[in-house]
Amino acid sequence: MIALSNALSRVFGSVAGYEFPSFIQKGINALYVKIFKIDLSEFEPLENYKSLNALFTRSLKKERPFDKTPNACIAPCDALITECAFLDNDSALQIKGMPYKAHELVGEINPLSPSFFYVNFYLSPKDYHHYHAPCDLEILEARCFAGKLLPVNKPSLHKNKNLFVGNERVALVAKDIQGNRLYFVAVGALNVGKMRFNFDKNIQTNAKAHLTQAYSYNPPIKVKKGDNLGNFEMGSTIVLFVQNTAFKDLKEKSVKFGESIGEFHAN
């Protein structure tokens, strides 16, 4: 199943990256925009994208404003928040009734502290596919886990136990503005050709070798709140684990990158 789902995603990625003649590509782009009801008001017009993948990975035409208050935590992406809560004995929910162990997702040996609050951000095919820093960060490590590329939509989350843990993913291990541990996990999915990270081009996902590896950064890579960390090549999921924060009531709400979703308490 791993080989099949990953192979399908690689094939889809190759097709999506193909540049058809402009008049054909414009029609393909227009159909995709219509099917998924994509709002292009913040982006270049659809005829500017030379491939479907270029449309998937579109950048904002101009910088989107965000809350620059130091203790504000912002949404890292445009997404639907499907679950959010404090960890319960290291358990988090991929969706209601489907728990998994948080330490397994991020690659730790020991259970995570119940002080961690987690948020699941589901990026659908219509969403802006880039992900950004939710606060000022020092990135210590990028842990890349080989795995399946199963869909991460709600029917699949209800059907497949430990889906996030079993799927290919990259877990960023970082320090937040207060020096507390923070995890930022990008989870792969079916038809997501790649997950890209701007701060390290060596990170390879959906590769044929199915390698699990870690990249350590000494000194840490410093990024500012709102900095573009990378992108999916279609929709997928970000899981954020943070400590010492107060979050708004977010479950089943759609958020936009830059929107304030909580704040860090003073240490």
Swiss-Prot record:
PTM sites of type Pyruvic acid (Ser): S236
EC number, as in UniProt: 4.1.1.65
Taxonomic superkingdom: Bacteria
Principal subcellular localisation of the protein: membrane
GO terms classed as biological process: phosphatidylethanolamine biosynthetic process
Active site annotation, chain numbering: D78 (charge relay system), H132 (charge relay system), S236 (charge relay system), S236 (schiff-base intermediate with substrate)
GO molecular function, one term: phosphatidylserine decarboxylase activity
A GO-annotated cellular component: plasma membrane
Subcellular compartments: Cell membrane
Sites marked Cleavage (non-hydrolytic): G235, S236
Pfam families per the UniProt record, alphabetical: PS_Dcarbxylase
Chemical reaction(s) catalysed: a 1,2-diacyl-sn-glycero-3-phospho-L-serine + H(+) = a 1,2-diacyl-sn-glycero-3-phosphoethanolamine + CO2
InterPro entries in the record: PS_Dcarbxylase, PSD-B, PSD_type1_pro
Hydrolase keyword on record: no
Topology of the protein relative to the lipid bilayer: Peripheral membrane protein
Cofactors required: pyruvate
Keywords noted in UniProt: Cell membrane, Decarboxylase, Lipid biosynthesis, Lipid metabolism, Lyase, Membrane, Phospholipid biosynthesis, Phospholipid metabolism, Pyruvate, Zymogen
Posttranslational modification: Is synthesized initially as an inactive proenzyme. Formation of the active enzyme involves a self-maturation process in which the active site pyruvoyl group is generated from an internal serine residue via an autocatalytic post-translational modification. Two non-identical subunits are generated from the proenzyme in this reaction, and the pyruvate is formed at the N-terminus of the alpha chain, which is derived from the carboxyl end of the proenzyme.
Cofactor: how bound: Binds 1 pyruvoyl group covalently per subunit.
Pathway annotation: Phospholipid metabolism; phosphatidylethanolamine biosynthesis; phosphatidylethanolamine from CDP-diacylglycerol: step 2/2
Subunit: Heterodimer of a large membrane-associated beta subunit and a small pyruvoyl-containing alpha subunit.
Function recorded in the entry: Catalyzes the formation of phosphatidylethanolamine (PtdEtn) from phosphatidylserine (PtdSer).
NCBIfam families the UniProt entry points to: PRK03934.1 (NF003038), PS_decarb (TIGR00163)
Name the record gives this protein: Phosphatidylserine decarboxylase proenzyme
Origin species: Helicobacter pylori (strain Shi470)
Lineage, highest ranks first: Bacteria, Pseudomonadati, Campylobacterota, Epsilonproteobacteria, Campylobacterales
The encoding gene: psd
